[in-house]
Amino acid sequence: MSTVNAKGAKPATDANGQSLNPEEPSEALREEYAQLSDRVREARAAYYVHDQPVISDAEYDQLYRSLEEFEALHPELKANDSPTQEVGGEVGAAFSPVKHLEKMYSLEDVFSTDELVAWLERAQKQVAELPGAPEVAWLSEVKIDGLAVNLLYRDGVLVRAATRGDGTTGEDITHNVATIKTIPQRLSGENLPEEVEVRGEVFISSKDFRTLNEAMVEEGRAPFANPRNAAAGSLRQKDPQVTARRPLSMFVHGIGYVRGVDLETQSEAYEILRGWGLPVSPYSRVLSTVAEVLEFIAEFGDKRHALLHEIDGIVVKVDDRRTQFRLGYTSRVPRWAVAYKYPPEEVNTTLVDILVNVGRTGRVTPFGLMDPVRVAGSTVEMATLHNQDMVRAKGVLIGDTVVLRKAGDVIPEIVGPVVALRDGSEREFVMPAECPSCGTPLRPAKEGDVDIRCPNAETCPSQLKERVNHAAGRGAFDIEALGEEAARALTQPVPLDAPDGTELSVPPLRNEAGLFDLTPEDLRDVMVWRDARRTVTDEETGEKVQRVTPELVPYFWTKPTKARPSVPSKTTEQMFAQLEQAKDTELWRVLVALSIRHVGPTAARSLATSLRSMDAIRQADPETLAGTDGVGPVIAQAVQEFFAEPWRRRVVEQWAAAGVRMEEEVDESTPRTLEGVTVVVTGSLEGYSRDSAKEAILKRGGKASGSVSKKTHFLVAGDNAGTKLDKAESLGVPVLDEAGFEQLLAQGPEAFGDRADAADQPAAGE
């Protein structure tokens, strides 16, 4: 899909040149829009909530722009809860939610100097139209690639710290932030405000990141992919002592809510923040002209890797705070600030080989193995090639010199070959005919699919490893001690030779059904290869030198010594304790852990809340499943296909037999006032975020729908309600304000008498 430029969207056509903008959108168009929205939401959640990006920044930017273009072409489909109207990600389940006193917005991104100049000139024009506004001065600063954090000080004392979350509600990380040495627990200086929110970015410096990763490797643990992931993962640790051991820093770059002090400009605010003892970035400057802003961007683009920390762009803000206030905000971004993103960096390297990886759903993905090369601040030696068609489209051969781009400073991408450097030794990549993990013939899931899959979902070791790793993930059973390496050891142990010459290669897990039946004794003989450092004598020089050699060691048990026998390691003990705790987890997490295709946390929550037990979900007909809020026919079909397979049913049955809870717990403390009642919430409410309003409805037995129809019983309308309010009024759906919503939650529809009865009557003309 083509991107939108500053002048507007291009008209969309299909492959035959037919218009994709009919007066009434088709069902296929609605489905396409829903899928595109879901892809953006999933990518955003992976980045902001789980700190595990699934696509590159550049891919996300393209995906996001495609959604913006779609909505520009089809405004009648645009939903109030579209990702284009939201800030950041959802609030994770691991920490308590806290509401910001003032909303934390995202920034509008531009990706070229032409786009930036257009934005600056447009902003200058808007300021010039404001009576009495001063000449525009631009505060320009580097955009730190870290995690946005909001600090709340009352009477100079730090009382709370939170992530940005969805912009309105974040995660309470106060105890973890308290371990960061550069953040003062108490402000210093004079004229301290009664209450102030200080916004900033938590990061790990480039030097500290290298040291941290060296230590991780030394301990036999996987290194972090980049400083941003390291910072975000460190800050979201459940144990603050772990956070305290990580080299986290912070620079503050703004103020949210403030009471008790007046600030005229952003640059003055920075000086005051510095005077209070807060860390302020040294990389900022107040500039007078657009030309100076462009020079600033070029300057820091040249020295970006020589800075204290990684950056992914430059932020430009109107310096005058009163002008900021008068320009205001959209629903997602301020009109007085913009983020310029540096172009992705490119280098040349050799494509040594193309291998394939088998994922959780059986998808076989080729990836390039390259000579290690440094790009965008990190060393890269692998990059995905997505599928065989993509390999052909890029025109790369094994042995080529290729252009490698670190797209968006996160995920590396092979752009294409440098054909002029070919010497005839290069060879084509051929997709294997059989699964490299289990030997099963590969095939598309259905005719016309680009992706090739291994159909042996039940016993393919690679798929099983990925499913076990997924089941243990933060969004499922949340078993921290069972990571990717442990999942591999459980499903793909190193084969051992028995005395009779046969191989002992039976894994502890043949499929995930036995996950909760494992015992420490089952894992005694599981071995893995580890690098061991040994001091040896160099044969040529006779000197003592350090050598690294592979060594076969137990993974789940300690290595035996003369003085001490082998016993389960502390991590193994933690894993079994966490497995036991996971048996009592919420039903929606169990659904996510099952790796049902298309069923992520959102759909799983809806199914669990609506149907309340695994048996009910398993026995539900397609119409019931599809009618569940946030599910639809595609997910409904995937759920039915899952339970149609006997081995998948055995997984559920064996987990249940092991004690995993398969029913939704009923909260007796909350009255079920909304049983059978469908409520739509639109616009902004003072006392509720979108998620908390939905949760309040679901907890009382109601259905929280995203769209208004003749089946809607009540519409709750806040500020900026939009088209849903118009539709509700045309259908005769009762409309409530926030006070009415709270009355509905407390007393149910009976509190509204005739208005509630009217909602069940068909609208005129039906």
From Swiss-Prot:
GO terms for cellular component: cytosol. Residues 1-30, 747-766 are annotated as: Disordered. One of its GO terms (molecular function) is metal ion binding. Pfam families: BRCT, DNA_ligase_aden, DNA_ligase_OB, DNA_ligase_ZBD, HHH_2, Nlig-Ia. Its EC number is 6.5.1.2. NAD(+) binds at residues 57-61, 106-107, 141, 164, 201, 317, 341. Zn(2+) binds at residues 435, 438, 454, 460. GO terms for biological process: DNA repair; DNA replication. The active site is at 143 (n6-amp-lysine intermediate). Keywords: DNA damage, DNA repair, DNA replication, Ligase, Magnesium, Manganese, Metal-binding, NAD, Zinc. It comes from the Bacteria. Its cofactor is Mg(2+); Mn(2+). InterPro entries: BRCT_dom (IPR001357), BRCT_dom_sf (IPR036420), DisA/LigA_HHH (IPR041663), DNA_ligase (IPR001679), DNA_ligase_AS (IPR018239), DNA_ligase_CS (IPR033136), DNAligase_adenylation (IPR013839), DNAligase_N (IPR013840). It catalyses: NAD(+) + (deoxyribonucleotide)n-3'-hydroxyl + 5'-phospho-(deoxyribonucleotide)m = (deoxyribonucleotide)n+m + AMP + beta-nicotinamide D-nucleotide. The keyword Membrane does not apply. The keyword NAD applies. Residues 669-758 form the BRCT domain. Belongs to the NAD-dependent DNA ligase family. LigA subfamily. DNA ligase that catalyzes the formation of phosphodiester linkages between 5'-phosphoryl and 3'-hydroxyl groups in double-stranded DNA using NAD as a coenzyme and as the energy source for the reaction. It is essential for DNA replication and repair of damaged DNA. NCBIfam families: dnlj, PRK07956.1. This is DNA ligase. The gene is ligA.
